[in-house]
From Swiss-Prot:
Protein name in UniProt: Mannonate dehydratase
PANTHER family from the UniProt entry: MANNONATE DEHYDRATASE
Keywords of this entry: Iron, Lyase, Manganese
Function of the protein: Catalyzes the dehydration of D-mannonate.
Reaction equation(s) it catalyzes: D-mannonate = 2-dehydro-3-deoxy-D-gluconate + H2O
UniProt keyword annotation of Iron present: yes
Family recorded in the similarity comment: Belongs to the mannonate dehydratase family.
Keyword Lipid biosynthesis attached: no
């Protein structure tokens, strides 16, 4: 298990590289060029600037999250080929700084969806919250307004330039079915996987968050069966999944440890976090401790350990604790606590395995 930490870049993150360096066991940054809109080529010059920053603290840049996929590709429009060519060029460029994994998603219009970025919990901390009834009855334009007005930082998937065309985007998907989206995803993969494979990069799709349709938009990476269907699209070694325990885990029917055990050899990158699911379908993001949520994080880590997982991991979202002012879900303190919880579990399983061998 190789521990990483998501970082949004200088002047775009409340967490510094100096602070990340002090978290035990973190060896690399999960990074992106967050000022580039979907469809643009990532310039090598800009990529090298990030590498220089990472090199000062001894971090690798093995994991990219995310090179966003342009909506025209998801929609299957004639213009998609030009954007796919740009995507290929970005793959080539990130390979030049040692990238090994590109995490991406294929969610239409919206990335991850929440109704409250700072929902107060019983202990006084705040966390990302999803209120099902609110989403079911809310105009998506209102959610856009609330999310963008409350955010101190631009959030991935909720960039102003992306949401400026919300009306056009929603209308474009009115007649797009899940089968259409699968077809468009396969077309994209057939074009980019050979380039990724040539450069030793694994394309690892992130599950839909939450793992069901929102605002009538199609979503397809939502379950164990969907993961199976996705992985069957290609037998390329560059074709894999970013297994996010919190995204898939928001649906109690998804058995995360079971999914890991079944597909572990196709998981180059893992997001490990916990969510507490309520009977009405709401969920809130909690600490990594199994008892605090609905996902058995101890068994999640055990599933990785017993299968000899050597891929990359990050703690994913955290609560906002100790009065930290930070990007929603991406503060320093709770993610650092999460890392230590994950290491504690991993070390315990390592010790147990050694005792069995002796």
């Amino acid at each position: 298990m190789r521990m990483t930490f998501r970082w949004y870049g200088e002047n775009n993150d409340s967490v510094t590289l100096e602070q990340i360096k002090q978290i035990p066991g973190v060896e690399g940054l999960v990074w992106a060029l967050h000022d580039k809109v979907a469809g643009e080529v990532w310039p090598l010059e800009d990529i090298m600037q990030v590498k220089e920053q990472a090199d000062r603290y001894g971090f690798h840049l093995d994991v990219v999250e995310s090179i966003n996929v342009h909506e025209d590709i998801k929609l299957g429009l004639p213009t998609r080929d030009a954007y796919i060519e740009n995507y290929k060029e970005s793959i080539r460029n990130v390979a030049k700084v040692g990238a090994k994994v590109i995490c991406y998603n294929f969610m239409p219009v919206f990335d991850w969806t929440r109704t409250d970025l700072f929902k107060e919990m019983e202990d006084g901390s705040t966390a990302l919250f999803y209120e099902k009834a609110k989403v079911d009855n809310m105009d998506p334009r209102e959610l856009v307004r609330q999310t963008t007005s409350n955010a101190a930082f631009t959030m991935p998937g909720w960039e102003p330039e992306r949401l400026a065309h919300i009306e056009k985007s929603l209308k474009a998907y009115e007649n797009v079915t899940e089968d259409d989206l699968w077809e468009h995803l396969q077309y994209f993969l057939e074009q980019v996987l050979p380039v990724a494979e040539e450069h030793g990069i694994q394309m690892a799709i992130h599950p839909d968050d939450p793992p069901w349709s929102v605002f009538g938009l199609p979503r397809i990476i939502t379950s164990e069966a969907a993961v199976e269907r996705f992985l069957q699209l290609s037998n390329s070694p560059a074709h894999g999944i970013t297994l996010c325990s919190g995204s898939l885990g928001a649906n109690p029917e998804n058995d995360i440890p079971k999914i890991i055990r079944r597909f572990h050899d196709r998981i180059p990158f893992a997001h490990i976090r916990n969510v507490k699911i309520y009977e009405n379908g709401d969920f809130i993001e909690t600490s990594h401790r199994s008892q605090d949520g609905s996902v058995n994080i101890a068994d999640v880590v055990k599933a990785y350990h017993e299968n000899g997982f050597t891929g990359y991991v990050r703690p994913d979202h955290g609560r906002h604790i100790w009065n930290e002012k930070c990007r929603p879900g991406y503060g320093l303190y709770d993610r650092a606590l999460g890392i230590m919880h994950l290491w504690g579990l991993w070390d315990a399983y390592e010790l147990e395995a050694k005792r069995r061998q002796s």
